[in-house]
């Protein structure tokens, strides 16, 4: 049997998932239970769309709870004191010059379980993340992206 997938995460990422899990287990489950009770009060379940919707919501929520529990159970938390100051790694904040857009961007390198590109938290497994990990200030990397090749220069590295 294969080993379960391990999720490299920052301490902040673990705390965020724990908060989401707590919300789903306490608040969301109660909301769904109430929706099911109300829908059952409407009688005939064969044509009860409120009941169907509540049961679907329940199934989705329970699946999400299992997913979060699995990620937390298999989380490998990055020790901030072990994050190198001069090499990009999980837990680093990296300021880069994006030559395609002629702008500076700051990314946080995180594990795939906590990636959020809209918040500039990119996974170490993403194309840009893979290209940056292991590099130093002054290094220039070419990254294969869906639109072609992007070029980034590492301007600064900090611990997360």
UniProtKB/Swiss-Prot annotation:
GO terms for biological process: DNA-templated transcription elongation; regulation of DNA-templated transcription elongation. The lineage of its organism: Bacteria, Bacillati, Bacillota, Clostridia, Eubacteriales. Pfam families: GreA_GreB (PF01272), GreA_GreB_N (PF03449). It comes from the Bacteria. It comes from Clostridium botulinum (strain Alaska E43 / Type E3). HAMAP family: GreA_GreB. Necessary for efficient RNA polymerase transcription elongation past template-encoded arresting sites. The arresting sites in DNA have the property of trapping a certain fraction of elongating RNA polymerases that pass through, resulting in locked ternary complexes. Cleavage of the nascent transcript by cleavage factors such as GreA or GreB allows the resumption of elongation from the new 3'terminus. GreA releases sequences of 2 to 3 nucleotides. The keyword Disulfide bond does not apply. This is Transcription elongation factor GreA. GO terms for molecular function: DNA binding; RNA polymerase binding. Residues 49-75 form a coiled coil. Gene3D superfamilies: Transcription elongation factor, GreA/GreB, C-terminal domain (3.10.50.30), Transcription elongation factor, GreA/GreB, N-terminal domain (1.10.287.180). Belongs to the GreA/GreB family. Keywords: Coiled coil, DNA-binding, Transcription, Transcription regulation.
């Amino acid at each position: 049997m294969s080993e379960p997938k391990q999720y490299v995460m920052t301490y902040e990422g673990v705390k965020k998932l724990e908060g989401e899990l707590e919300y789903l287990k306490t608040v969301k489950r109660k909301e769904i239970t109430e929706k099911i009770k109300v829908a059952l009060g409407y009688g005939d379940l064969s044509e009860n769309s409120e009941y169907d919707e509540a049961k679907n919501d329940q199934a989705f929520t329970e699946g999400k709870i299992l997913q979060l529990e699995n990620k937390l159970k298999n989380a490998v938390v990055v020790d901030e004191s072990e994050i190198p100051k001069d090499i990009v790694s999980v837990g680093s904040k990296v300021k880069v010059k994006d030559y395609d857009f002629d702008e500076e961007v700051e990314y946080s390198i995180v594990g795939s379980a906590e990636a959020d590109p809209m918040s500039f938290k990119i996974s170490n497994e993403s194309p840009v993340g893979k290209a940056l990990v292991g590099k130093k200030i002054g290094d220039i990397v070419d990254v294969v992206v869906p639109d072609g090749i992007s070029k980034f220069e590492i301007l600064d590295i900090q611990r997360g």
